[in-house]
Amino acid sequence: MKSASCRKTLFWNLMATVGLLLIGGVPCAGQSNSIGSVGSAPKTKIILDTDIGDDVDDAFALGLALQSPEIEIVGVTTAWGDTALRARMVRRMLLEAGRAAIPVAEGIVTKSPTTFSQARWAEAGPAAKERIDAVEFLLSEIRKNPGGLTLVAIGPLTNVGAAIERDAATFRKLKRVVLMGGSVRKGYGDLGYEPDRGPMAEYNIKCDVAAAQKLVASGVAIFMMPLDSTQLKLDEVKRDVLFHKNTVLTGELAELTAEWGHNTPTLFDAMAVAYAIEPKLCPVTKLRIEVDEAGFTREVKGEPNASACLESDAEKFFRFAMPRWMKPTAPAK
């Protein structure tokens, strides 16, 4: 007879398979998933700039990047608040994924109004052997890859603003910035079930308005994932499927969600990573965006300076992301 623990493991493995079928994550024999399939295309080189450790969606975003073979993570830079502790958290995730060789650079330290909810988990991560400055790291990597590097910015834009201030000409040599930030036509909690609340001052923008203003004026191609398209709820069914899949990453995400202390994560930041891999997941509209002093991203008349995703299909997103989060961790060779 199988032990109770063995029967429980078999049960949850079965539930994970059923869950993937329900969300469309497992293609039938002879079929392929046209979104996110890996061909012979060169890898997308990214730097991820993140305020990981407050809300839990940054961890899901980093996990998605680590589990996506289409991406080469050139480095991770930490933004806002206690950037050294955030860097320890990133190093721990990379170490446990077998990806410790990825550079982690510490950004500009600031005061933060937000609680570092996952600090206890982060404190178990390794400290830096030698501190790498995030702003200089970003500019150095752009110089090495002119026109070939994507910056995925999923936190307040302090490091970005400092890089523009330090060397705007080099910053303009980025291929693009994929930004989780802003609110163009919809705000927080606007999920289509009640009258529109209208745009709001979104957190990543309002934390450092001056930096956001520098970015939209920089001349770099900006692909903006605002609140309009990123309020993606990881509901109870998906959480049960994901957190009972016994892998390194799913274990981390379960622990971090528990430390975060709320029931249902909204995976704002994961959409920015998903877009960097597969733009079909969040079709964009060219707009002219201005950032006002209150942190609103205003849609105004004039020559477009950004491409914004104003609507997304949550089901397609989760069909893309869930199988990646759930697959066994495969360290880069």
PLM regions and their residue ranges:
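N-terminal secretory signal peptides that target proteins for export/translocation
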Residues: 1-8
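Position-driven detector of the extreme protein N-terminus
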Residues: 2, 13-16, 323-327
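Generic hydrophobic-segment detector
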Residues: 9, 14-15, 145, 172
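Bacterial N-terminal signal peptides
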Residues: 12-25
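N-terminal acidic, glycine/proline-rich low-complexity segments
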Residues: 28-333
